[in-house]
UniProtKB/Swiss-Prot annotation:
It is found in: Cytoplasm. Pfam families: Prefoldin_2. The keyword Chaperone applies. It comes from Thermoplasma acidophilum (strain ATCC 25905 / DSM 1728 / JCM 9062 / NBRC 15155 / AMRC-C165). InterPro entries: PFD_beta-like, PfdB, Prefoldin. The keyword Metal-binding does not apply. Molecular chaperone capable of stabilizing a range of proteins. Seems to fulfill an ATP-independent, HSP70-like function in archaeal de novo protein folding. This is Prefoldin subunit beta. The gene is pfdB. NCBIfam families: gimC_beta. GO terms for cellular component: cytoplasm; prefoldin complex. Belongs to the prefoldin subunit beta family. Keywords: Chaperone, Cytoplasm. Heterohexamer of two alpha and four beta subunits.
Length: 124
């Protein structure tokens, strides 16, 4: 809730801070979901590597289950997905850190401006 006696500038800064906070939360959620997906892919890859090459392997696509003919191709695809997910996670982490830094800077700027406005109001 925005106080009615603060300047329009401060109200705008507070809205920006709120938007940054929401974006940080969204990125954290995306990172969490990707991290879960990455762990699942790594576990799947570990299990695939334990299997003998002659063991039948099945894969689901949507609601369809089909037999995989080429285990190596499946392992390679999974490796590629893991690498892409790691890159995406790294990118999201950098974005989140950047937004967190901007948020801290904005918090400090808001605090300073609020204190300045209160000093002016107290001396008037």
């Amino acid at each position: 809730m925005v106080e009615p006696n603060i300047s329009a500038y401060l109200q705008n800064q507070l809205r920006q801070a709120q938007e940054l906070e929401e974006n940080i939360e969204k990125l954290a959620t995306q990172r969490y979901q990707l991290d879960l997906s990455l762990k699942e892919m790594q576990k799947t890859l570990d299990e695939l590597n334990k299997l003998d090459d002659n063991t039948p392997i099945y894969r689901t696509v949507g609601s369809i289950l089909y037999r995989v003919q080429d285990k190596k191709k499946l392992v390679d695809e999974l490796d590629e997905q893991i690498e892409l997910t790691k890159i995406r996670l790294s990118t999201l982490e950098k974005q989140q850190k950047s937004l967190e830094e901007k948020y801290k800077e904005l918090q400090n700027a808001i605090r300073d401006r609020y204190n300045q406005e209160n000093k002016k109001g107290a001396t008037s």
